[in-house]
């Protein structure tokens, strides 16, 4: 089994916390699932979620995912060892209308390159919030060959 930082099948792949903010989701979560040959497409054991607020950053959701992943393992370890746990094929979620998306690192990273033309677009601030973390390069505006980094609140706590 694997803990995945994203609600499956909607958020397969990487940087799901960042994409949840950019996509203006109201919830973000993690999934305990079986490993299969495809990326994050194994049967689901359990999903845990938390609210995404207008103030949530990528770092906030990353920290929440660490806590939730621990809870998933803690809450399911006995049933996993006994073979009595849930095992729900992701296709059941898809058949009930859940989206099935796969996020790739490079596609997500490209979203952090902002322009001043779009500064009043609500997505602009969501991108800034999503990439506000010490774990990767923040969102930026290019001026010539220089990058001006845009932060939301990282470093103020």
What annotation goes with each model-predicted range?
Residues 85-157:
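Internal anion-binding site segments
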